[in-house]
Swiss-Prot record:
GO BP annotations listed: 'de novo' CTP biosynthetic process; pyrimidine nucleobase biosynthetic process
Pfam families: CTP_synth_N (PF06418), GATase (PF00117)
Taxonomic lineage: Bacteria, Pseudomonadati, Pseudomonadota, Gammaproteobacteria, Lysobacterales
Record text on subunit structure and interactions: Homotetramer.
Substrates-to-products reaction catalysed: UTP + L-glutamine + ATP + H2O = CTP + L-glutamate + ADP + phosphate + 2 H(+); L-glutamine + H2O = L-glutamate + NH4(+); UTP + NH4(+) + ATP = CTP + ADP + phosphate + 2 H(+)
Protein name from the UniProt record: CTP synthase
Biological source species: Xylella fastidiosa (strain M12)
UniProt-annotated binding residues for Mg(2+): D71, E139
């Protein structure tokens, strides 16, 4: 059986369970172990696909088309393992599975209850997602004490009884607040959080203590005494300047050794080689250049809605030792044609979104970038905005729009996809009356790049795969007309039915590229992504007056 590390949180939410868990996973991976991660989310939605970005933040998409929590993005940025829908489990999905089994008669007339039926289904999902790995980390969303989390906590308590301490570990993340008026750290919230956890039947093996500053040894001893946790296993997690430095911090305190010792894996692992993370941290702390990128979006008041976009831009910068400053611009604010927010910036990125609110602002951002020769990178809705702009103002198609926003448009250059193939090769069909949840073109899709294009140059390959999440697409009726007007179709789906990327000729614009996919989902701090690296490089060139002062890379 795969050894399991269960990660819970206490005191308050948003302490960084996902980052802490992913950082530990990266250390274990660096020791030669095959690692995976699972997120258990207590909400009753089947998945976050239809949840508001203002409430939930980004919807992260996996290769197999699962719409998941943004924590899976953290996981994939820290470890090499590519995750799937098995790695994202919600209360809604658990109940959906159990009810389907009950309707089929699988329970043979039994009264279906939380224990054992719901907890058994949770355990089954954990087993399915973690089989064949050396170690798995399972994060339980929410905070200990939340009523929604109780079935998950009961399930992992049962797993501990079944597998024992040599195959399970409980890791609890708590808050140790600093009270400025008293000038001291307070351990009482941590003590109460562990007390709450123990009342459920779970005794933590490791405590990760979040704090604004380093926790003194005297406070660590106090926490260990009152929580029945070894002092060695009370790990401090102080605020750090660089997020990607967390693996180095946890390794310094020996967290991986605690895991190796408890699971008795010392004979199967090597010392952790964290040189890649050291290089990442060094590149972030010591940039040789910097640029300012405007992100023109609909949900900029809640930055988690664009979490992967922001991280991918930073990755693109650190791959060339460039600090990327992000300027968040509300798309609606541009609709009065006041482009002041886009002055003195080095590049414009327009990310994905849904609905007509702010769309005209995105179109105006595309037009501004095109006319002012500012590097432009459009993603998903950002590509659609660029197509609408080009159709209206270059191709002369007055009234051009997306049918998502105007079903009566005289020139629907963007329209609903009614038929496409899924990642498994099955044909999907949709219309305007279809359900919203899980009905988009989702997951990793291959596309063929056109020779001689900027896209082909950046990728260095003829065929690439990118993750998608959209239900509207370039209308093929306008392909020829827009190409005749100068628009370059840089990539198409493998069956030649869908336009995947567009760009402007380089004699018309130094760097104008847009894609229907979401390349941010495949960007990592250690590797970056070709499109983001190229975009940041173009922004550097604009800032330098068209010629880079220095070529740098890590």
């Amino acid at each position: 059986m795969t050894p399991l590390i269960f990660v819970t949180g206490g005191v308050v939410s948003s302490l960084g369970k996902g980052i802490a868990a992913a950082s530990l996973a990266s250390i274990l991976e660096a020791r030669g172990l095959k690692v995976t991660m699972v997120k258990l989310d207590p909400y009753i939605n089947v998945d976050p696909g239809t949840m508001s970005p203002f409430q939930h933040g980004e919807v992260y998409v996996t290769d197999d088309g699962a719409e998941t929590d943004l924590d899976l993005g953290h996981y994939e940025r820290f470890v090499r393992t590519r995750l799937s829908r098995k790695n994202s489990v919600t209360t809604g999905r658990i109940y959906q599975n159990v009810i389907c089994k009950e309707r089929r008669g699988d329970y043979l007339g039994a009264t279906v209850q939380v224990i054992p039926h719901i907890t058994d289904e949770i355990r089954r999902c954990i087993d399915e997602a973690t089989a064949s790995f050396d170690v798995a980390l399972v994060e339980i969303g929410g905070t200990v004490g939340d009523i929604e989390s109780l079935p998950f906590l009961e399930a992992i308590r049962q797993v501990r009884i079944e597998r024992g301490a040599e195959r399970t570990m409980f890791m609890h993340l708590t808050l140790v607040p600093y009270i400025a008026a008293a000038g001291e750290l307070k351990t009482k919230p941590t003590q109460h959080s562990v007390k709450e956890l123990r009342s459920i039947g779970i005794q933590p093996d490791v405590l990760l203590c979040r704090s604004e500053q380093v926790i003194p040894d005297s406070e660590r001893r106090k926490i260990a005494l009152f929580t029945n946790v070894s002092e060695r296993a009370v790990i401090g997690c102080p605020d750090i300047d660089v997020l990607y430095g967390m693996p180095l911090e946890l390794r310094r305190q020996g967290l991986d050794e605690i895991v190796i010792d408890q699971f008795k894996l010392s004979g199967t692992t090597s010392l952790a080689d964290l040189s890649e993370w050291e290089d990442v941290v060094d590149a972030i702390k010591h940039p040789l250049d910097e640029v300012t990128i405007a992100v023109v979006g609909k949900y900029v008041d809640y930055r988690d809605a664009y979490k992967s976009v922001g991280e991918a831009l930073k990755h693109g910068g650190l791959r060339q030792r460039t600090k990327v400053n992000l300027k968040w611009v509300e798309a609606q604010d541009l609709e009065g044609s006041d482009m002041a927010a886009l002055k003195d910036i080095d590049g414009i990125l327009v990310p994905g979104g849904f609905g007509d609110r702010g769309f005209e602002g995105k179109v105006l951002a595309s037009r501004y970038a095109r006319e002012q020769r500012v590097p432009y990178f459009g993603i998903c809705y950002g590509m659609q905005a660029a197509v609408v702009d080009y159709a209206r103002h270059v191709a002369g198609l007055e009234g051009a729009n997306s049918t998502e926003n105007d079903r009566q448009s005289s020139h629907p250059v963007i329209a609903l996809i009614t038929e496409w193939r899924t990642t498994t090769g099955e044909v999907e069909r949709r219309d305007e009356k279809s359900d919203l949840g899980g009905t988009m073109r989702l997951g990793l899709q291959e596309q063929r790049l056109k020779a001689g294009t900027l896209a082909r140059e950046l990728y260095g390959r003829d065929v690439v795969g990118e993750r998608h999440r959209h239900r509207y697409e370039f209308n093929n009726r306008y392909r020829t007309q827009l190409e005749d007007a100068g628009l370059v179709i840089a990539a198409k789906s493998m069956d030649d039915t869908l336009v995947e990327m567009i760009e402007l000729p380089r004699e018309m614009h130094p760097w104008f590229l847009a894609c229907q996919a979401h390349p941010e989902f495949l960007s990592t701090p250690r590797d970056g992504h070709p499109l983001f690296i190229g975009f940041v490089k173009a922004s550097r060139a604009r800032k330098a007056g068209g010629k880079l002062l220095r070529e740098v890379c890590v």
